[in-house]
Amino acid sequence: MAAVVALCRKAMETVKTKEFRDYLASTHFWGPVANWGLPLAAFRDMRASPDIISGRMTTALIFYSMAFMRFAYRVQPRNLLLMACHGTNIVAQSMQAGRYLNYHYGGGTTAATTAAVSAASATSTGSVDSSATSTGSVDSSATSTGSVDSSAATTPAAEDPVAHSNCQEITCCYLVTWDCD
């Protein structure tokens, strides 16, 4: 208990010094405080859908943070708060980059699209799709015809949002998205 009291006393003495007040009024403090918004936003977006992640911006933020992390270490006096902020941002952006790569190149998009297209084709054509046969569910009208529809999930028109008549292409900041009603 005495060690905690001594630590608190030492912290209070440090806070009361002119050097600490000058530090709180400097850009060495407020610059990193403002920069903490980047990693905090990245960690908050971990729960968001990975289709909103911009691969270009994530890559740019990783390189930006690496450059400023080196700067924070090399500048005199060293700005360890800025270095910690950018180190955290590198971790957060790397996690977002992993989510982006997994979604766009690791099967995240294809699996979601294939499941949606297979479900839609099974209900509209009355046939059994490849995912339904693997789970053991069979449409009652498909049992009479005995047809299996595995081509619907692999056709380019099934994965292309433009093929649907109620979709609009929206281009903003080098990111192309589809707005479907």
Swiss-Prot record:
GO cellular component labels: mitochondrial inner membrane
Biological role: May mediate the uptake of pyruvate into mitochondria.
Source organism of this protein record: Bos taurus (Bovine)
Disordered: annotated span: 125-154
GO terms, biological process: mitochondrial pyruvate transmembrane transport
Bilayer-crossing regions: 23-42, 52-74
UniProt xrefs under InterPro entries: MPC
Lineage of the organism: Eukaryota, Metazoa, Chordata, Craniata, Vertebrata
Principal localisation: mitochondrion
One term of GO molecular function: pyruvate transmembrane transporter activity
Topology with respect to the bilayer: Multi-pass membrane protein
Signal peptide: none
Top-rank lineage group of the source organism: Eukaryota
The protein's name in its UniProt record: Mitochondrial pyruvate carrier-like protein
Keyword annotations: Membrane, Mitochondrion, Mitochondrion inner membrane, Transmembrane, Transmembrane helix, Transport
Pfam families per UniProt: MPC
Family assignment from sequence similarity: Belongs to the mitochondrial pyruvate carrier (MPC) (TC 2.A.105) family.
Compartments, as annotated in UniProt: Mitochondrion inner membrane
